[in-house]
Amino acid sequence: NSTRFIIITNQKIFRKDAKKVSICFEIAHESGSLYHMLSHFIYNNLNMTKIESRPIEGRNWEYRFFIDFDGNLADSAVKNALRGLRDEARNMKILGNY
């Protein structure tokens, strides 16, 4: 088990020394949809360190994925991967860069 403590703000704060990014998104319940999402990490040579899925309440067989990966929001590879993920995901959110 692990516990995370976070500070929530409505302001975007970018740190140059941040080394990890956390995101979440939803995808359709279709064959290969998760594979296509994860390919953005492979093509941009990003190291995914954690993935979790949680069922979406009231929507059978649909899940929200929480992913941590190494990088900084200022990195071009991270920007490129996030652009691709946004194009394919539903409700993608950047949870933090720390």
Q: Where is each model-derived feature located?
A:
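Domain-level signature for soluble enzymes in the chorismate/prephenate branch of the shikimate pathway
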Residues: 1-98
